[in-house]
Amino acid sequence: MSVAQRGVAGTLEDRLSTLAPTVLELADDSAEHAGHAGAAGGGGHFSLLIVSEQFSGLTRLARHRAVLDRVADLIPHPVHALAIRAYTPDEFPS
């Protein structure tokens, strides 16, 4: 299924499911960025909260890379910006 058929958020969620997250919250923040340079249409801005045991022993940078490796082909279009908060289950402030 293509990104257009599944939707950008759905595609992101599908790709990130390979990290076996216990929490995966994806927010579309695009409306807050409408009209700014690089995303004149305002689309493609997302915030991600992801909790996975697979992040254990990884630095913050390595966690971000693990996320970005799965969605790199979607950046810069259709994903213009992705704010990432990545935790292990032990770190997650529940």
Model-derived regions, located:
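N-terminal, polar/charged subdomain of small-to-medium soluble alpha/beta proteins
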Residues: 1-94
